[in-house]
Amino acid sequence: MDLNNRLTEDETLEQAYDIFLELAGDNLDPADILLFNLQFEERGGAELYDPAEDWSEHVDFDLNPDFFAEVVIGLADSDGEPINDVFARVLLCREKDHKLCHILWKE
């Protein structure tokens, strides 16, 4: 993989959020979608992390943090606080030529 051909952090967040919005209707409870839409402006967010270790239970490849990122999308108790009501965890490959995405949805 090419370190010079990676999505920036902002591009990674934007791509994960776009995928979340596109697929949320098929994967989240309607009440959760309504809550997210009503509360996102005040206390919603998307946070970028290195992939958590538990992804190894869901995917069968090396999650090198140089090329993979986890984006947590959800709601916090208040603006500026960490997300504690997680609606989706999105695993993305950051290499621009390698489109790969896995999502763990709120149950």
From Swiss-Prot:
InterPro entries: dsDNA_mimic_put (IPR007376), Put_dsDNA_mimic_sf (IPR036763). It comes from the Bacteria. Signal peptide: none annotated. Pfam families: DUF440. SUPFAM superfamilies: Putative dsDNA mimic. Coiled coil: none annotated. Belongs to the putative dsDNA mimic protein family. May act as a double-stranded DNA (dsDNA) mimic. Probably regulates the activity of a dsDNA-binding protein. This is Putative double-stranded DNA mimic protein Spro_2690. It comes from Serratia proteamaculans (strain 568).
